[in-house]
Amino acid sequence: GISKLQAQEVADRGFNVIVRPTNYRNVTSEDLQYVFKRLEGIPHVTGMIFAGKEALGAPNLTDETLELLHKNHIPLVGIEAVNQLQYEPQQGFLEMAAKDEYSVGRVYTIAKDELKKITPEEAAQRFYISDIERNIRFNLFPMYETGVNNETVLQTTINYIGMATEKLAAKGYEFGPADIYPPYTPNPLLVVLTMTGAIALFVYVVQMLIPMPKHTQLVAFFGISLVSIVVFIVTSGTLITQIWALSSAVMAPVGAMIRLMEEWRRYDSARPLGATKATVLALFYLVIAALFAAIGGMYIASLLGNTKFFMEFAIFRGVKLTFVLPVILVMIAYLQRFPLWKGRMINSKEEAKKFVVEFLTMDVKFYVFFVVAALGAVAWVFVGRSGHTAGVPVPTSELMLRRFLENTMYARPREKEFIIGHPALMLATFAFLRKWPSVIHFLLTLAGVIGIASMVETFCHLRTPVFMSIMRGYDGLLIGALLGLLLIIAVRFMMYATQWFQAREVDHE
């Protein structure tokens, strides 16, 4: 039930009222009427959050509960799950949300056990980030059980709420009755048009990996498009759009990297370029690759841009694949275009078969096992830190860097982009144009695809506003380009220093 006296007291003190009814055992229509009757005369009731594991009216009377909510103009609000992915399970809630066309509120809170472990500053930061990045419009601030910095429990709690409020106000957020996202479904014709664009991207990239004549490409494009459109019409459309969103997330960075390889090959037979020109081209090609990959991000946002995904009642499937597959496909494309394996390019069926046989039968030194183990550890961290939830803990130093970036930039860029991917890709271009060893260029290229793929994967988190995803990629590109330039300068300095010392040794001899 609901305490009418408490609700009235909250309203009398000038606050908005959020009610949290508990479901009845063997609930009846009379029980529901009783709950809402107790709300009569109480002003500013701006949301209902169910307590416990059941929605009010579950399992059979949730339609009646929803009707009473509409009648009293009270928004339905779901509780974000502890892992920050979708919602806490409450029987009947998902069905009610679907009938409301997913136009519901989303509340974020911190578990009391977790609150004990973090500072008030960290708690305020978590509420701030949750609100701006995950479509949170309701905050449930728990109270600290003990005071901090010689303050009372109440003052400590008020202080961290105040810090969160100040941060949000600086971002332009207003406080009061929370806005509820209206139902939004894009025009089906525009979705189909975007889907055909994603199919065209798929065919375009596949033919760069498996060469095919123009007429075969056209047949593949029109055939796949026809089947996809039929599936879209016959079904609700969610599954087929998810498939092509996943395809875009993989093919866009792969296509960007292959096009970049084709540009590199233009300089394959030429003499090493000057260091300055190679540096300028490294920056230029990074920007071009990022813009190409952004096509995939726009396709994802357009295909899955509806309230069901915004409010995370449906999520992008295959996030980890968007990190692994681009690396594998780019590795294949590289071996097709550059003579890395024993001075040969693997660009035919015969060469591919020969490569497999030679690879599986080659002699392996003992140290290779340590190298493979190290690469496996890197892959574990890389994949484990990706996706909607992270399975690898984040070190304290990185958390400090994240908080700094969150407070100084519009959207915190991803470390794998501006620390690893973008600088590595710039150095890969520089390495090729300066005729460095092929193995170094190959490894830098694989590291470079991480940043480009991560830029596209950012758009797979549909709960984050698309403009923020764009700015996250832009900020990462900006910092990554600066770090890439510094990396190239540092490498050039080390090479010059090495040559100078070698020349001195020769002179002394």
Predicted regions and their residues:
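Soluble extramembrane regions of membrane proteins in the secretory/endomembrane system
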Residues: G1-P188
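Charge-biased, low-complexity intrinsically disordered regions
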Residues: Q6, V10, V35-L39, P43-H44, ...
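Substrate-binding cleft/loops of secretory-pathway carbohydrate-active enzymes
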Residues: E88-M96, P188-L201, A453-V456
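Alpha-helical transmembrane segments of integral membrane proteins
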Residues: T196-E509
